[in-house]
């Protein structure tokens, strides 16, 4: 049991505080599930609604670029440039959430599957890893305030996410600055 876990053990919390903690954890879990569902449906409005404005993003493993601060709208345009032409499915597991009042941190394991039938190689690209996110309670509920995507490994055809596409280049530059 880590320090965060010990601080919120059932014996140390009154019933009302336990219910509040469980509610907050469920709301944060729901944010992550909407985040993934928005990606899978290519519902960029749903996806953007899971993020604070502005928020910090670290997608170094995908982009090779340093962390940046951006807006949900600009980030959703980047996600669309990466994924719009693909069939995708994001699965999350092993949720670990640490609450700190109106702030929270969480680690969420993911398997992200990407598929595009093509003539140039494998039709799939799968990423295995986790998100290390921070969250903030807002007037609209919990939202992601820091998004960090870490790959443990990948398999398949990484060129399905076409970083040479001018739309991808433009969207990446809007988030991270020029390459």
What are the language-model segments listed below?
Residues 2-16, 84-179:
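A beta-strand edge to alpha-helix "cap/lid" segment located at domain peripheries
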Residues 23-26, 79-83, 176:
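Generic secondary-structure transition motif, activating predominantly at the C-termini of alpha-helices
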Residues 44-112:
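A solvent-exposed, acidic/Ser-Thr-rich amphipathic alpha-helical stretch
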Residues 10, 17, 29, 60-61, ...:
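Generic, low-specificity signal for short hydrophobic/alpha-helical stretches with a mild N-terminal bias
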Residues 1-49, 53:
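Short, low-complexity N-terminal intrinsically disordered segments enriched in polar/charged residues
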Residues 18, 22, 65, 69, ...:
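Charge-dense, low-complexity intrinsically disordered segments
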